[in-house]
Each structure stands twice: as C-alpha cells, then as structure tokens.
Amino acid sequence: MPRNNLNVNEKSFTEIKLLGKGKGGYSYLVTDGKNEFVLKQIHHEPCDYYKFGNKLEAELNDYRRLKEVGISIPEMIDFDGKTERILKEYIKGSTIYDLVLNGEVKESYLEQIRAMLKLLYPAKLNIDYFPTNFVVQNEILYYIDYECNSYSDEWNFENWGIKYWSKTEEFMAYNKT
C-alpha cells in the first residue's frame, strides 16, 4: 500500500499509520526519514456532544495554556494554518487505555495524574481525562491531547475521568463499542 506524503509548511512527511481519530482531527504517525512525529489533521466532521469554533486556533491556545500550567505534554513542533495541520512530538509508549485492558496500570501513573490535577485545578482547567489521551513513556505519564476546558465538577477527574482508568462498568461498556 503506498504511503501518503503530508506537508506542514511545505516540509514533507511520510505517513506511517493512523494513530486515531478524535473530536477535532485525525492523528497520524509520520516520519521525515530520520525522526517520527504525530501529525494532527483538523477535521470538520460534526460532533453531537461538543461545539467547536476555530479548531486550529483552539488547539494552539490550549497548547499554550497547558504549557503555562506545566503538565507533561508533547512539544508542538510546527503548525500550518493553510492545511490545518499540527506537527508534534511523538510520545512512544502504551496508552492508559491499553494498560487498563491489560491490567498494567501502576499506582505511580495515578500519582502522576493527581500531580497534574494539582496544577490544572488552581488554573481552573479540566483536560480530556479519557485514557486514550494519556501515554506512558519511560514511566512518565504524558497527556498527548492539547484539549482543555474551563473547570467543572461534572467533568473533573474524580467525577468523570477516573471511571475509565480501571475496568469499571463504564470502561467495559465503552470497550464493547
């Protein structure tokens, strides 16, 4: 199967594989021939449960907010406003989702998410705590999405996110879909 070439500001990257699709875009593992990166292509598909304005602008603003707060996220390497693409550091490792499935979530990962919460909550922010948005590389937990929202109790980690960080009824129901 031929691989697609994807450009970011006229720099060419070769698609290795689709990593996943989220509310705002498709994420691809790409290479420049030397290094691997994640290329996020913004999409404009409807989302029943989320309202968007300018998705690229929102991603850029959210990235800045999360960098200021200081949680572990992949570095943004570049972005292309014309093609609505973001190039970011590739964090190679297992997602919390996969670790939950395999019964391999360690207490240290929960300690690390709690440390993130101590930075996020005073800044009045929530992130998307779904376990596919977290990758462990060299025992360090990274939030690999850039989405963040104003804090609300309903969507905080303790009331929503934690339900998907172990084999709960909610996690198992989602896993069947």
Specify the residue positions occupied by each region the protein language model found.
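Conserved structural core of kinase catalytic domains
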Residues: 71-110
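Hydrophobic residue at the +6 position relative to the catalytic HRD Asp in the kinase catalytic loop
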Residues: 129-134
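C-lobe/activation-segment region of protein kinase-like
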Residues: 122-125, 137-177
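Conserved hydrophobic core/spine positions of the Hanks-type protein kinase catalytic domain
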Residues: 112-119
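Juxta-kinase regulatory segment immediately upstream of eukaryotic protein kinase catalytic domains
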Residues: 1-17
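ATP-binding glycine-rich loop module of kinase domains
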Residues: 15-57
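Protein kinase-like catalytic core scaffold
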Residues: 37, 72, 86, 142-144
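The N-lobe alphaC helix and its flanking beta3-alphaC-beta4 segment of protein kinase-like domains
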Residues: 51-69
